Design a protein with these regions (language model features):
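N-terminal pre-ligand scaffold of iron-sulfur
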Residues: 1-95
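Long, hydrophobic, well-ordered secondary-structure blocks that form the structural core
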Residues: 79-133
Length: 133
């Protein structure tokens, strides 16, 4: 894989090597070095959803393939959260829905608030030092 240098002086600019556009290694490196580290636009607030709305989507399909869910809480705040349960990696929300008060994983019932913070897990309410935040 050819290495290239980007000079801070614009007068010394040059194009990227053609290998950057056609080699798989560059594609994979751009995922880890660029796309996984930057903000990615997924929408604006023109389509404001009512409280309790959950909208699952895949962030950058065929590139990151990151499952996320947009949730709107009772204050109208919109959150973009990982759509993968922290326990077993199951998708938490499979299709868009409304009127929800929590996110609940279908595997063991682990629950999260609409802002993504941990709420509860069945049969663990009496367990000492079990995470609650």
């Amino acid at each position: 894989m050819e290495i290239f240098h980007i000079d801070e002086d614009i007068r010394k600019s040059e194009t990227l090597p053609s290998s950057f556009y056609r080699e798989r290694a560059w594609f994979e490196r751009s995922i880890s070095e660029i796309w996984e580290k930057c903000w990615i636009f997924i929408g604006d607030n023109t389509d404001q959803n009512p409280a309790g709305t959950l909208t699952p989507m895949i962030l950058l399909p065929d590139v990151l393939n990151e499952p996320v869910v947009l949730s709107t809480d009772s204050d109208g705040e919109v959150y973009c959260l990982s759509n993968v349960c922290t326990h077993r990696g199951k998708l938490v929300v499979s299709s868009s829905c409304s009127g929800q008060r929590i996110l609940r994983c279908g595997y063991h019932g682990r629950c999260f608030r609409l802002n993504g913070t941990f709420k509860s897990m069945p049969e663990f309410d009496q367990t000492e030092n079990f995470p609650t935040e």
